[in-house]
């Protein structure tokens, strides 16, 4: 992390030269009243703990149960890791700021936070698309599943997803550190996000916004299209199953993932395609909370409640811990 911050500082100095630049940002958060701050602290601390524990249990259960050592659950374990990392990237700093009554964050820390927020949003998107394809193969081509979705292929897809996420985040970061912020350093947000930072800059952000639009649209459209057509084929295949038990088994395999997909893209449509024209800053905050806090917290419940294999693995893990006491 220190090396990354040093890299940001060097890059910033190269592009900005001797011009006066800011050294920190002020995060305004949600409310200014102290009583609201205390409520926010308790609320976000609770959601943070639930998210870390829930997703952590999924990762441990998958790693300990050899039956779940398949590409399907490799993707789920990585999604849980990304969810833990996503909420840990923003919420702890916000909680510290509330307790210390300090709203400042250094320039390097802010850009680093922005970098990782992009990584985790993109990886979530890519993993959801990859998981949809995995479910398509499992339901529509069950006899060829072990051939089409070999463990090495699952690992390759995971590595590619993480690689692309970091490349996209690095691209936005390298473009951002070339911008000047003059004397404007107040962010109407609870963490450093790309869109509010671009609005704050006093430089020309046309290239940044163009790259954000093109890359962002590509990152959304490709996984969404893959998920959409995968589930169209899955639904058609399930409807052709004659037995009720067979239909239920197919639904339990992909139902939890479909719920997460609908939640994820429903959030995108609701927040970014139908934004509030009167309070655009509130829209940014709502979108950030849904992506970085609410969705990561809900995901473990969806996967554990609606996935038979996952429920069995979690039950084994809990029983093992109880018996060891």
Swiss-Prot record:
GO-annotated biological processes: signal transduction
PANTHER family in UniProt: OLFACTORY RECEPTOR
Lineage: Eukaryota, Metazoa, Chordata, Craniata, Vertebrata
Topological category with respect to the lipid bilayer: Multi-pass membrane protein
Cellular compartment(s): Cell membrane
Glycosylation positions in this chain: 18
InterPro entries xrefs: GPCR_Rhodpsn, GPCR_Rhodpsn_7TM, Olfact_rcpt
Keywords: Cell membrane, Disulfide bond, G-protein coupled receptor, Glycoprotein, Membrane, Olfaction, Receptor, Sensory transduction, Transducer, Transmembrane, Transmembrane helix
Cytoplasmic side: 63-70, 134-152, 233-249, 306-325
Pfam families, sorted: 7tm_4
Principal subcellular localization: membrane
Superkingdom of source: Eukaryota
Protein family membership: Belongs to the G-protein coupled receptor 1 family.
GO terms under cellular component: plasma membrane
TM spans (from-to): 39-62, 71-92, 114-133, 153-171, 209-232, 250-272, 286-305
Protein name per UniProt: Olfactory receptor 1S1
GO molecular function terms attached to this record: G protein-coupled receptor activity; olfactory receptor activity
Disulfide bonding pattern of the chain: 110-202
Side of membrane Extracellular, spans: 1-38, 93-113, 172-208, 273-285
Function as written in the Swiss-Prot or TrEMBL entry: Odorant receptor.
């Amino acid at each position: 992390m220190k090396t990354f911050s040093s890299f940001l500082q060097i890059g910033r100095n190269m592009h900005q030269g001797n011009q006066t630049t800011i050294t920190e940002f002020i995060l305004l958060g949600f409310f200014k009243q102290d009583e609201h701050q205390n409520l926010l602290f308790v609320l976000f601390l609770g959601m943070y703990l639930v998210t870390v524990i829930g997703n952590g249990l999924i990762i441990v259960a998958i790693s300990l149960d050899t039956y779940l050592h398949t590409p399907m659950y490799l993707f789920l374990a990585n999604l849980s890791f990304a969810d833990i990392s996503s909420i840990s990237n923003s919420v702890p700093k916000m909680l510290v700021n509330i307790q210390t009554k300090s709203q400042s964050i250094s320039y390097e820390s802010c850009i680093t936070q922005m970098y990782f927020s992009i990584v985790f949003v993109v990886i979530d998107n890519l993993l959801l698309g990859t998981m949809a394809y995995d479910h398509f193969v499992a339901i529509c081509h069950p006899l060829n599943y072990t051939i089409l979705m070999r463990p090495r292929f699952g690992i390759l897809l995971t590595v590619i997803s993480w690689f692309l996420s970091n490349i996209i985040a690095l691209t936005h970061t390298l473009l951002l550190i070339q911008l000047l912020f003059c004397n404007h350093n107040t962010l109407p947000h609870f963490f450093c996000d790309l869109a509010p930072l671009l609005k704050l800059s006093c430089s020309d952000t046309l290239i940044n916004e163009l790259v954000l639009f093109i890359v962002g649209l590509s990152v959304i459209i490709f996984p969404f299209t893959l998920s959409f057509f995968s589930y169209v084929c899955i639904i058609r295949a399930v409807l052709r199953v004659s037995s009720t038990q067979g239909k239920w088994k197919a639904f339990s395999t992909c139902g939890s993932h479909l719920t997460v997909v609908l939640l994820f893209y429903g959030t995108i449509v609701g927040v970014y395609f139908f934004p509030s024209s009167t309070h655009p800053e509130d829209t940014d905050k709502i979108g950030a909370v849904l992506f970085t806090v609410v969705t990561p917290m809900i995901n473990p419940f969806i996967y554990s409640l609606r996935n038979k294999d996952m429920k069995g693995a979690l039950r084994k893990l809990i029983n093992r811990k109880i018996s060891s006491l």
